Amino acid sequence: MAELPVFEPGSYRYIKAVFQYSGGVAAQPGYEIERVRFAKPLPLREAYAAVEAHLKAIGRRTTAFAACELRSPDPFTDQGFYDFNQTYVQTLERWGIYKHGDDPVNPVARTNVCPMYDKPVEPVMYAFSYTVPAQRIASRGSFIGSGGGEARAGGREYRGRIVRLEDTSPEGLREKVAFVLAEMERRLALLGFSWSDVVTTQAYTVQNIGHLVGELMAARGACQGGLVWYYARPPVIGLEYEMDVRGAAREFVL
């Protein structure tokens, strides 16, 4: 397992990425990750209050907050996404998680996508995850991966980094999906896991990827727990395909 930074107040390690989110999180020994989905997604301000109340009720501090899944009305421009993220991290800073600076620290994993139908009128929180003391000494490891789209690592602007930009042909989609799957595998390995540890695999796209599910996903073991396909777009204009994976210890609906 690669040596990853550890967010000690939250009892989880994380893949350092960009200021708005990490590449994924995994519970440290002696802890595990629980996931809660809201029965009805909540506007962010209400969601933050609900998260605080839930963590307080189970005896956990806000620093146990490890991941969230958001839904936005429509894909952002690069500047719009940056502005949204600047506001988003303010709550994480208040919770004692995010640290500003020349090299900002944000250990929290995140997925943010835009439903094609039943769009929210403002950004909402769909689900969140946090660490708790493990219920069993031999508890299996638990982790949450951030959402990842078909953009190579780089600067703030996405357009120049998108794989097969504006190409939604069968072969264009094949390359996009293959790129994202490779990135999911890389993150899993960094966290100390593999496809065999994944409990839930989720895809987000409005493009037809049916011809790729067997060949690219199931054949490599990415769908052992099935595939959850959300008819939604990634959060930035130009992106067509996003995925995330997780292996939570337990999941609840609130």
Spans of model-derived segments:
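Short, polar/acidic, helix-capping and beta-turn segments at strand->helix junctions
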Residues: 1-254
